[in-house]
Amino acid sequence: MTNSLDKKVALVTGAGRGIGAAVAQRLAASGCRVILTARSSDQLDRVREQIEACGGEALSIVADLTGDEDVEHLVQQAQTWGPVDFLINNAGWGKRASVVRADVADWDQTFRLNLRAPMLLAKLLLPAMIEKVAGAVINIGSVSGKRGEANGAAYSASKFGLIGFTQSLYEEVRENGIKVAVILPGFVDTPLIPPNKQLDRSKMIQADDVAHAVHYVLTSPPTCCPVEITIRPQRTPYR
């Protein structure tokens, strides 16, 4: 038997497009009340309108998660439907550059968005979940968090850190009935991946594949928690 998501409140970061939008749409279709957040109001409004057109409930809140004040304000605004049941930390950013040539300011932004923001959001939202003895924190990581690559040191390090955070948080709150998981997709076909003649995008992981994994965690039996899920393409997308 799976858990009902009807009327559960889900906060999805980076929900304006790509994986975040797909997660928000799938959860709304499953009955969740979805709070969308990103930096672009236009993108958020488009996703919210798509959800509402299908009969779902959604609220959009513009926020820059690299700033603590924005994060705290987001958490306050997210109480519209009551305490948040599910936190989906999807927002992420990275700029490719060698360690020698990288701008340290880019490192700071990468770590603040990819690691610090998920930790701060969890810190602020978990007390209500602990009180209810129910809830979930799902972090969208990357296979780059399992194996580093050249010119991606900060991004990989932030995703390695996200895995460590997930594992630690799981141990802290597992007895409170709260599911904690990290999903590690490979190359996903989103607007962030530029056109490349060597890539067959139809064979790439799709955003909804990741959304399906999120839904799987949230509806898994209360006796188990899929703490880490790696998603790889079934067939190689390289021509």
What are these regions (language model features)?
Residues 98-99, 106-111:
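Substrate-binding pocket helix/loop in short-chain dehydrogenase/reductase
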Residues 16-17:
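Conserved glycine-rich cofactor-binding loop
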Residues 142:
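Residue(s) in the substrate-gating loop at a strand-loop-helix junction
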Residues 122, 158:
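Active-site helix of classical SDR
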Residues 42, 62-73, 104:
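The beta1-alpha1 cofactor-binding region of Rossmann-like NAD(H)/NADP(H)-dependent oxidoreductases
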